[in-house]
Amino acid sequence: MVREKVRVSTRTLQWKCVESREDSKRLYYGRFILSPLRKGQADTIAIGIRRALLGEIEGTCITRVKSKNVPHEYSTIAGIQESVHEILMNFKEIVLRSNLYGTCDASICVRGPGYVTAQDIILPPYVEIVDNTQHIASLTEPIDLCIGLQIERNRGYLMKMPHNSQDGSYPIDAVFMPVRNANHSIHSYGSGNEKHEILFLEIWTNGSLTPKEALHEACRNLIDLFIPFLHKEEETSPLEDNHHTVPLSPLTFHDKADKLRKRKKEIKKKIALKSIFIDQSELPKVYNCLKGSNLYTLLDLLNKSQEDLMKMEHLRLEDVNHILVILARKHFAIYLPNKKFEIDFEIYCYSIFFH
């Protein structure tokens, strides 16, 4: 066994990648260290990160296959070497990378004879295949193979439900996890009261994310989960004096926004905007437009005007409204009354985020 020498910090907590490699298009490996940690801290951090890596990161999969004139899943088709079931299993193995929000459609239309591979799939522009060589079927005769596909972005597992195959639709068990495996080890050094720990973290991914990207996303998800605990339970809302509703006079949009914008400074003091990332569940796919412009946190949004956002490619006004409404509902709910209230969330969002 070869002992490796790894230089670590003895003062400031630091992390770094000590090994990174691409074993194949569908297998990436990365090894990271975090130090110095006090006794017990390494295990606490490792357990949380490993669970987040395996359960909190979203992935993209083919979840349904549609084809006419197929009697059942275990039937065979003349001119195709594989059974329908084998073709479904081949679709299950295809690794996708996407900026998708929810579901979308794709298709294959190929004429034999020849091999059908992942590169024959016709995809929307925001979905790409990690390995185009993945095998789907072998056509032994000059027949047409036309298949419709449903693609979904989600997390964890999706078990196929009982279905009626008469419509030619077949669900597929989906594994949305981009991280194939994650291990950790802990090494101690020092003595007495100066004893510390080094955390080694190993990550394997399916190629849709690099191990470093997976680690960053897992950490962001953990931060999002812990943020509510940073706020006092008795903390009240700046809107609480208005009871159930916020009366909106028949003013122009800008007048309403100016009126609500005065509360921005107070809200900013109460929320660690710098620590709230916007790539959370239930956010629309337009987040990827923001990400492309290096907007990751709510604080990043604060530094942009409405005009700045509207200049971004593929971003429409209704998209901006939608994402800000969701962010307001999710991150500012702790400052609103517990009882049901009525408020124009779009105006509320604009009053906070736009100067």
From Swiss-Prot:
Q: Which SUPFAM superfamilies match?
A: C-terminal domain of RNA polymerase alpha subunit, Insert subdomain of RNA polymerase alpha subunit, RBP11-like subunits of RNA polymerase
Enzyme Commission number(s): 2.7.7.6
A cellular-component GO term for this protein: mitochondrion
Q: Which family does it belong to?
A: Belongs to the RNA polymerase alpha chain family.
Q: How does it assemble?
A: In plastids the minimal PEP RNA polymerase catalytic core is composed of four subunits: alpha, beta, beta', and beta''. When a (nuclear-encoded) sigma factor is associated with the core the holoenzyme is formed, which can initiate transcription.
| Classification via NCBIfam families | rpoA
UniProt protein name: DNA-directed RNA polymerase subunit alpha
Which organism encodes this protein?
Jasminum nudiflorum (Winter jasmine)
Q: Which gene encodes it?
A: rpoA
